[in-house]
Amino acid sequence: MLNEEQVKKVAHLARLELSGEEVAQFTTQLGSILDYFQQLEELNVTDVPPTTRAIESSNITRADQLHPWAERENILAIAPEQDGDFFRVPKIISTED
C-alpha cells in the first residue's frame, strides 16, 4: 500500500507543492490505482498477443513542413531577454533531490 511519505517524495521529484489535504487525497487515489494494477497483474494473458492499441489505426500524422514566419523578428524584439535567435528564460529546474 502506498503511504504519504511516498506521495511526498513523488511530489518533490515532480516539483509539486502539495498541502497536507492533497497528500492525503492523492495517497488514497494513487493507492486505488496501484491496487487496480495489482488486479491486472493477476490476469492470464499468455495467449494475448502484444499490442500498443486496442483498435488498429494507420499513420495519421503528417510530414513536418518548415515555413518562414514574417513576424519572427518582431517577436524576438519584444522579448525581455534573448540570446541570438533564442528566448532567454530563467532556470527553473535544479539538480537537487
Curated annotation (Swiss-Prot):
Pfam short name (any one): GatC
Keyword set, alphabetical order: ATP-binding, Ligase, Nucleotide-binding, Protein biosynthesis
EC number: 6.3.5.-
Domain of life where this protein originates: Bacteria
One Gene Ontology term from the biological process aspect of the record: regulation of translational fidelity
A GO molecular-function descriptor: ATP binding
Signal peptide: none
Gene3D superfamilies with a match to the protein in the record: Glu-tRNAGln amidotransferase C subunit, N-terminal domain
Reactions catalysed: L-glutamyl-tRNA(Gln) + L-glutamine + ATP + H2O = L-glutaminyl-tRNA(Gln) + L-glutamate + ADP + phosphate + H(+); L-aspartyl-tRNA(Asn) + L-glutamine + ATP + H2O = L-asparaginyl-tRNA(Asn) + L-glutamate + ADP + phosphate + 2 H(+)
Top-level class of the enzyme under EC nomenclature: ligase
Subunit details: Heterotrimer of A, B and C subunits.
Described purpose of this protein according to its UniProt entry: Allows the formation of correctly charged Asn-tRNA(Asn) or Gln-tRNA(Gln) through the transamidation of misacylated Asp-tRNA(Asn) or Glu-tRNA(Gln) in organisms which lack either or both of asparaginyl-tRNA or glutaminyl-tRNA synthetases. The reaction takes place in the presence of glutamine and ATP through an activated phospho-Asp-tRNA(Asn) or phospho-Glu-tRNA(Gln).
Similarity-based family: Belongs to the GatC family.
Name this protein carries in UniProt: Aspartyl/glutamyl-tRNA(Asn/Gln) amidotransferase subunit C
Organism from which the protein derives: Cyanothece sp. (strain PCC 7425 / ATCC 29141)
Lineage: Bacteria, Bacillati, Cyanobacteriota, Cyanophyceae, Gomontiellales
Gene: gatC
